[in-house]
Amino acid sequence: MTVVELSPFSMLVPLIASAVCALLPGRLWPWLLTFAAAAASAVIAAITLAAAMDGPLSYAFGNWEPPIGIEYRIDAANAFVALLVSAVAAVILPWAKTSVDQEVPERQGPFYALFLLAFAGLMGITLTGDAFNVFVFLEISSLATYALIAHGQDRRALLAAFRYLIMGTVGATFLLIGIGFLYMMTGTLNMVDLAQRLPELRDTATVEVALAFIVVGMGL
């Protein structure tokens, strides 16, 4: 397996582990699986970063070549961010275990499954080279985060999760509208392709509105 073929597994490992984690009983096994998945993702991200220092890596899902297919395009910058995200996830888990035991005293599998989903979403946002997939991974991460907030024993946790859901939904809608406008103007969702086509359209009102929607959506 080449580094290019290995690179998507920094997102796929926590995504697959989340499905398994939801079924695990007790406290220890879900935590161990979550820590192992985060550590494995960090190792893969480190290997990817080392390879990306020599030039961008491109992985086309389903052998559909970009810009038609979905592309993972990894350069040194986003590979470093992926390593940072995965390393932080792995480092905080041992320290967070005591707090999780207090907040979720019973079966912790679903809690750690949601954590892994949120983590996988963040990794997907970092690595994808497709604008619509940024939206998809953002929604995966956001929905998992809403559920994590609602896990708190304090009754205010549900209200906080609901407020977060409303704000997140509005923000995601703005983001999707902005991406839709960009697609309407350029005919592509591939970020490299967008970067090549947008300079010719930068003074058009539609592109300016699209960027405004994206900025507001990400801000919310």
Predicted regions and their residues:
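Alpha-helical transmembrane segments of integral membrane proteins, especially early/N-terminal helices
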Residues: 36-50, 132-136, 169-181
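Transmembrane helix-loop junction
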Residues: 22, 50-51, 150-151, 184-185
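Transmembrane helix-loop-helix hairpins at membrane boundaries of multipass inner-membrane proteins
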Residues: 1-8, 16-113, 192-196
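Juxtamembrane/interfacial segments at transmembrane-helix boundaries in multi-pass membrane proteins
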Residues: 51-69, 140, 174-220
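Hydrophobic residues within membrane-embedded alpha-helical segments of Major Facilitator Superfamily
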Residues: 10-13, 17-20, 81, 88, ...
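Short hydrophobic "helix-edge" motifs at membrane interfaces and signal-peptide entry regions
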Residues: 3-5, 16, 64-66, 119-121, ...
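Internal transmembrane alpha-helices of multipass membrane proteins
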Residues: 60-69, 74-173, 202-205
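Juxtamembrane helix-boundary/capping and inter-helix hinge elements in multi-pass membrane proteins
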Residues: 26-27, 151-158, 186-189
